[in-house]
Amino acid sequence: MIFDVPDPDFARRIRTSFARQGLTETIGATLGRVAAGSVEIGVPFSAGVSQQHGFFHGGVIGAIGDSACGYAAMTLTPAGAEVLTIEYKVNFLSPGQGEQLIARGRVTKPGRTVTVCTGDVFVVSGGQEKLVATMLVTIMTVGGQRDVSPTMPTTPMREIAAHDRSTPSRWCPCRRLRAIKLGFRVVAR
């Protein structure tokens, strides 16, 4: 598929963004091929990315597939734009048992605001690739914002007191969670 590329310097922008991600650094991920509409990310096997049976953890498989798709979408955004995942669905096809994971994300349908991507995650064992997961990822373009950070709230936080079992049941844990989702900051008394 041939895409219009609004930022000819997209590869540098993606490599810079990738280097700032804490999760990818933590799991040892490396950014491979970066092309218009597609990106490849690899993760070597280690105890830190395994689950109890010695396979790659499903969360790691989903995370690198999501990242590969997100960066594939970002290759088609204008300079200064960022991307955020709206949703993704992953189908696990086989246990991730091998030396390395490789995620390949590609744009299926680009859009000005919403882009749909597909991703495949392979495990490499003995030099052979095996498909372990496939996913559908929906990405939102956040135009012109250089830093989209959860540490910089867009709405002011309001404070409420935490439920201490002696307060009325209206502050039970489920209501505290709801209050947090509504932008309240729960504080202990």
Indicate where each model-derived feature is located.
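Hydrophobic beta-strand-centered segment that forms part of the acyl-chain substrate-binding groove
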Residues: Y71-I102, V107
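Non-catalytic linker/capping segments at the edges of enzyme domains
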Residues: M1-G42, P150-R165, R170-C174, R189
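Hot-dog-fold acyl-thioester-processing enzymes
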Residues: P44-A68, M157-R158
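A generic structural signal for short beta-strands and their flanking turns/coil linkers
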Residues: E25-I27, G37-V39, E82-Y88, E99-L101, ...
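Short, intrinsically disordered C-terminal tails of secreted or membrane-associated proteins
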Residues: I180, F184-A188
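Residues at secondary-structure transition points
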Residues: F18, G22, T26-A29, Q51-A63, ...
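HotDog/MaoC-like acyl-thioester-processing domains
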Residues: I2-V5, P95-R165
